[in-house]
Amino acid sequence: MTEKQKLRMVLLLQNECNLAKAKEAYEFVIGSDAEDVPVATGTGGEHKCNVPDPRKDGVYLRYSDGHEEWFDGKNKKENVIGIAVHLGERHTCIAKFDVEDDDEGDKEFPLQENNNSDTEEDKKAFITSYFDAYNDLDGKKHTESLMRRGCKIPLAENQYIPSQGEWLLVLMFFKKVQEALEYACGEMLKDDWYWSSTESSSSSAWGVVVSYGSISYSIKTNTVRVRPCLSCEAI
C-alpha cells in the first residue's frame, strides 16, 4: 500500500468505517486549497506540481474487447461489460448487473447452505479483523473455495464474488461508480445488503450495506444480493 492508501485506511478505521467522515478527515489532512499546491510556470503554461494524474486512480468503463477507458461521461456506451476501479496497485471490476436466477427470478441468495465440508485449510482463510478484511483482495480464490464447498449462487463464467477489500474500493468511489453504471445502462447498486466472499467463520461471512457503507458479518444462510466481479479471463 502507498502512504496515502495507508492514511486512508487508518482514517476509515478511526471513523468507524464511516466513509463520509473518513473522506472529510483525509481532505483536511492532505489539504485542497490552491495556495497549498506549488505552481510552476513556463512556456508550457501553468502546472500544479505534486498533483497525481487523475487518470491513474478512479473509475473506468471496461469493454468486451478488454480495454478500459477513464469514465468522463463522454465514453461510448456500446459493449461496456463492467465498471472498474483503480487505486494505486489495487483494482477490481464489478459487473453491470446483480446476479439473478434465470429460472426463479431470485436476486437474493445464501452464501452457503451448510458448513459440513469446511477443512482445516479452508478455516485458515477466515478473517475476523476489520483491518485484514479491508486488505483482502482474494475474491476469486475465495469464490472458488466456496463453490467447492457447495455455494449455489448462479455466477456466470469468469465471474466471482468480490472480497471485502474489493468492496472497499467500490465504496470509496461509490458515487462515481453509480454514475458510471447508470451511464452504461447497467443496474445501479441497491440500498441493500451485498455478500462478499471474505469469510469470518464456518457459519458467517462479511457483507456490506450499500445504503450507508457499513460492513459486518452475516450468517451464510441469510439470503443477500450479489454483485459479481469480472475476472481477468472475462477481458
Residue ranges: model-predicted function:
Residues 140, 144-160, 164-220:
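An exposed tryptophan-centered "aromatic clamp" motif
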Residues 2-157, 220-235:
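Short, compositionally biased
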